[in-house]
A protein has these predicted regions:
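Extracellular glycan-binding segments that recognize GlcNAc-based cell-wall polysaccharides
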Residues: 1-194
Length: 194
């Protein structure tokens, strides 16, 4: 049962591919909203039930259509009923008043889109590898408490979209989560000197 936080907003991310959900953590903390998971082409029953029971008005989707399809977005926007066998359950979701999508061509670009939307003036940025989830999972909670975005990077190279984000931001403090096996010294130096 949901008793605290923002009762009208949820973040929706792929439960099949973790990076967008990790990038969305800071936004969820800022919004005081949960992250619900979905499949690319269908909404799991537990997510449908949450949307219907909570009567969500705003849904923020992490990732473009290759992560979460237009069909899922349409169901979120227009609503749905939940069937139990041959009967319609009392849980009917009338659709969101607002559906917002935050995504880019890949996980790195998506992290910058979410960062710019969530904390556009943050002077702190948290970096974590986009290649596995443990460090980024820790980074999301830390970033949310510091009102900072999480940017995902490669182990051995700094994506150009991250360089561009760094150049156009007012970053005064960086936090890199993970050791050299997650983010190489080379990338760490690029982040420091960007």
């Amino acid at each position: 049962m949901r008793e605290k936080g923002n009762t009208k907003v949820v973040e929706l991310a792929s439960g099949e591919n973790y990076p967008d959900a990790l990038s969305m953590t800071s936004m969820a903390i800022k919004d005081k909203a949960p992250i619900l998971l979905t499949k690319k082409d269908s909404i799991p029953m537990y997510t449908k039930k949450a949307l219907a029971e909570w009567d969500i008005e705003t849904v923020k989707i992490a990732g473009l259509h290759k992560a979460i399809s237009k069909e899922v977005e349409k169901q979120i926007d227009e609503g749905f009923s939940i069937a139990k066998g041959n009967k319609i359950d009392s849980n009917i979701y009338d659709g969101a008043l607002s559906v917002l999508r935050y995504g880019g061509a890949n996980r790195y670009e998506t992290s910058t889109v979410i960062a710019a939307a969530t904390h556009p003036k943050s002077s702190i940025v948290v970096y974590a590898t986009g290649e596995n989830f443990p460090d980024a999972l820790v980074a999301g909670n830390y970033a949310g408490r510091k009102k900072a975005p999480v940017l995902l990077v490669n182990r051995d190279s700094l994506p150009s979209v991250i360089k561009e984000y760094n150049e156009n931001s007012n970053i005064r403090k960086i936090v890199v989560i993970g050791g050299v096996n997650a983010i190489s010294d080379y990338v760490f130096d690029l982040i420091l000197n960007d």
